[in-house]
Amino acid sequence: MSNSASGMAVCDECKLKFLELKAKRSFRFIVFKINEKVQQVVVDRLGQPGESYDDFTACLPADECRYAVFDFDFVTDENCQKSKIFFISWAPDTSRVRSKMLYASSKDRFKRELDGIQVELQATDPSEMSMDIVKSRAL
């Protein structure tokens, strides 16, 4: 069933894995990709709870678009332990124009399927999603 401006469907596994990340903290991050053959957003990679932000950024392809969610743990200025779920739209400059357009037109609808996103980041190169930027957006 397609449900976005681009006619893109969202695989049920995407929603189920996101719920596991949110409710059970079963994963540190999830990377999603659009399978153009079947016109559907699917799970590309699951990050285990012990994996770091560096592990997450290392698994994003240098020349292909992806969506991702990352469960970011941090300590506030008041010394409180918190976490926020980031939605990251990764569209590197070196990716195909058609791919960038497809990801851009499907993003809002896909994001609505993932109830509980707290912060959104868009990045075209690694510097736009550095740890400093993530920390500043979380606080």
Swiss-Prot record:
Isomerase as a keyword? no
Q: What Pfam families does the entry give? A: Cofilin_ADF
Which intervals of the chain form a coiled coil?
none
Is this entry keyworded Ribonucleoprotein?
no
Family statement drawn from the similarity comment of this UniProt entry: Belongs to the actin-binding proteins ADF family.
Q: What is this protein called?
A: Actin-depolymerizing factor 1
Transmembrane regions: none
Q: Which domain of life is it from?
A: Eukaryota
**GO terms for cellular component:** actin cytoskeleton; cytoplasm
The record's section on InterPro entries has: ADF-H, ADF-H/Gelsolin-like_dom_sf, ADF/Cofilin
Residue ranges constituting the ADF-H domain according to the UniProt record = 5-139
- What are the GO MF terms of this UniProt record? actin filament binding
Q: What role is this protein assigned?
A: Actin-depolymerizing protein. Severs actin filaments (F-actin) and binds to actin monomers.
What processes in GO biological process is this protein linked to?
actin filament depolymerization
> Can you name the source organism?
Oryza sativa subsp. japonica (Rice)
Q: Which UniProt keywords apply?
A: Actin-binding
